[in-house]
């Protein structure tokens, strides 16, 4: 029986009960917990260094009001990286290939940045809908365009993450299938294809980390406009 390449993106279930909640909760179990002593081990030290470095880089362009988001954005970044990396393992489900999950992250956080801007500085927040120096006849058109641009931001966040991960997984599966098909017929070509598969896997590892960083970075840029 021929298995569809898109079956890997179907949400797993056991006895009719969806297991996506288990897939989402699993990354938090894998993180090491700092021990109750003065000296940490190497893994805790590396984890702390990475979180501090990322948080400083992310919070640098924000003012003091935006620093309250440091814990949330850093946690989201680590969570997305872990899910994306675990999804590269064979026979594993990647929750971030589901648009519904990514939109569940993007919409509330984007809406929170908009609400903060409307509450703290409503004049500046509304001023983003109309570029400075716009000719009077173009004002209604530009307001509509900027409003649409504002509303599609969470959709762009979710679709970007979903599309990049889905495309990478499909390419890996297609090339891996080609290796198995070519191996008995043309071993030399199969070995070359396997080398391409290895390089593509390394590229997908980089994409998994970069897309998580881009997701959080864009949220911080939206926050920067409203704090």
UniProtKB/Swiss-Prot annotation:
> Where does the record say this protein resides?
Mitochondrion inner membrane
MF terms (GO), sorted A to Z: proton channel activity; proton-transporting ATP synthase activity, rotational mechanism
Record membrane topology: Multi-pass membrane protein
Q: Where are the transmembrane segments?
A: 9-29, 69-89, 98-118, 135-157, 179-199, 202-222
Q: Which cysteines are joined by disulfide bonds?
A: none
Tell me which positions the record assigns to the signal sequence: none
What is one Gene Ontology biological process annotated in the Swiss-Prot or TrEMBL record?
Answer: proton motive force-driven ATP synthesis
**Family stated for the protein in its record:** Belongs to the ATPase A chain family.
Q: What does this protein do?
A: Subunit a, of the mitochondrial membrane ATP synthase complex (F(1)F(0) ATP synthase or Complex V) that produces ATP from ADP in the presence of a proton gradient across the membrane which is generated by electron transport complexes of the respiratory chain. ATP synthase complex consist of a soluble F(1) head domain - the catalytic core - and a membrane F(1) domain - the membrane proton channel. These two domains are linked by a central stalk rotating inside the F(1) region and a stationary peripheral stalk.
Principal location class: mitochondrion
Tell me which UniProt keywords the record has, alphabetically: ATP synthesis, CF(0), Hydrogen ion transport, Ion transport, Membrane, Mitochondrion, Mitochondrion inner membrane, Transmembrane, Transmembrane helix, Transport
> What InterPro entries would the database entry show?
ATP_synth_F0_asu, ATP_synth_F0_asu_AS, ATP_synth_F0_asu_bact/mt, F0_ATP_A_sf
Q: Name one GO cellular component term.
A: proton-transporting ATP synthase complex
Q: Which reaction does it catalyse?
A: H(+)(in) = H(+)(out)
What name appears for this protein in its UniProt entry? ATP synthase F(0) complex subunit a
* Top-level taxon of the source organism: Eukaryota
Quaternary assembly: Component of the ATP synthase complex composed at least of ATP5F1A/subunit alpha, ATP5F1B/subunit beta, ATP5MC1/subunit c (homooctomer), MT-ATP6/subunit a, MT-ATP8/subunit 8, ATP5ME/subunit e, ATP5MF/subunit f, ATP5MG/subunit g, ATP5MK/subunit k, ATP5MJ/subunit j, ATP5F1C/subunit gamma, ATP5F1D/subunit delta, ATP5F1E/subunit epsilon, ATP5PF/subunit F6, ATP5PB/subunit b, ATP5PD/subunit d, ATP5PO/subunit OSCP.
CDD domains to which the protein is assigned, alphabetical: ATP-synt_Fo_a_6
């Amino acid at each position: 029986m021929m298995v569809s390449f898109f079956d890997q993106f179907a949400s797993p279930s056991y006895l009719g009960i969806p297991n996506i909640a288990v897939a989402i909760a699993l990354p938090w179990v894998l993180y090491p917990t700092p021990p109750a002593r003065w000296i940490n081990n190497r893994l805790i030290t590396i984890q702390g260094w990475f979180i501090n470095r990322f948080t400083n880089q992310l919070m640098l362009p924000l003012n003091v009001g935006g620093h309250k988001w440091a814990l949330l954005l850093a946690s989201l970044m680590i969570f997305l990286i872990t899910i994306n990396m675990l999804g590269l393992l064979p026979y594993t489900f990647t929750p971030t290939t589901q648009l519904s999950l990514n939109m569940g992250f993007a919409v509330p956080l984007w809406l929170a940045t908009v609400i903060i801007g409307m509450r703290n500085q409503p004049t500046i927040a509304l001023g983003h809908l109309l570029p400075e120096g716009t000719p009077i006849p173009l004002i209604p058109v530009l307001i509509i365009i900027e409003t649409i641009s504002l509303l599609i931001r969470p959709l762009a966040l979710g679709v970007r993450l979903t599309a990049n991960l889905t495309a990478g997984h499909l390419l890996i599966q297609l090339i891996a299938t080609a290796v198995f098909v070519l191996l008995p017929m043309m071993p030399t070509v199969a070995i070359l294809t396997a080398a391409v598969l290895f390089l593509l896997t390394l590229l997908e590892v980089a994409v998994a980390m970069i897309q998580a960083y881009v997701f959080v970075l864009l949220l911080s840029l939206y926050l920067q406009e409203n704090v």
